[in-house]
Curated annotation (Swiss-Prot):
GO terms for biological process: translation. Part of the 50S ribosomal subunit. Residues 30-39 have a biased composition (Basic residues). Belongs to the universal ribosomal protein uL15 family. The keyword Ribonucleoprotein applies. It comes from Methylacidiphilum infernorum (isolate V4) (Methylokorus infernorum (strain V4)). The lineage of its organism: Bacteria, Pseudomonadati, Verrucomicrobiota, Methylacidiphilae, Methylacidiphilales. GO terms for cellular component: cytosolic large ribosomal subunit. Residues 12-43 are annotated as: Disordered. InterPro entries: Ribosomal_uL15 (IPR030878), Ribosomal_uL15/eL18 (IPR021131), Ribosomal_uL15/eL18_sf (IPR036227), Ribosomal_uL15_bac-type (IPR005749). Keywords: Ribonucleoprotein, Ribosomal protein, RNA-binding, rRNA-binding. This is Large ribosomal subunit protein uL15. SUPFAM superfamilies: Ribosomal proteins L15p and L18e.
Length: 150
């Protein structure tokens, strides 16, 4: 068997439906749209959910619930283990982005307590977990919380 002998299985390649190309094609004259009416016209389709002027189901059913997702603040999580070996005394967002610990778009930085810290750092961040705060203060470091601006 040669490569030029290979053919697709029967029925695997469906022919494109060519409309308006003669009566014998089966899709001539009205091109499968029927006779007249809104759906036969160009651009003539009703919007989704339209029920002919009757009050649509989506508007008949009452609204329920709410969410505050719009107001949620997404912090970039930074563990203490990721900060081992940093030479600078002050750790802020610009430094964390520069060394590649924080990437992407976030509303702020949150320091988490996974890992240990030995050097005394000054953190200028938006939030700190309780375990991280304890470990930072134990190592002699300070935390300056920044108010996040939406």
């Amino acid at each position: 068997m040669m490569l030029n002998d290979v053919r697709p299985a029967i029925g695997a390649k469906k022919r494109k439906k060519r409309v308006g190309c003669g009566e014998s094609s089966g899709h001539g004259k009205t091109s499968g749209r029927g006779h007249k009416g809104q759906k036969a016209r160009a651009g003539g389709s009703i919007r989704i959910g339209f029920e002919g002027g009757q009050m649509p189901l989506i508007r008949r059913i009452p609204k329920r619930g709410f969410n505050n997702k719009l107001f949620h603040v997404f912090y970039a999580p930074v563990n203490l283990s990721a900060l081992q070996g940093i030479q600078q005394e002050v750790i802020d967002e610009s430094l964390l982005r520069q060394i590649g610990v924080v990437k992407g778009k976030w509303d702020g930085i949150k320091i988490l307590g996974k890992g240990e810290i030995t050097q005394a750092y000054t953190f200028k961040v938006h939030a700190v977990s309780a375990s991280a705060k304890e470990k930072i203060e134990k190592a002699g470091g300070k935390i300056e919380l920044i108010k996040s601006t939406p």
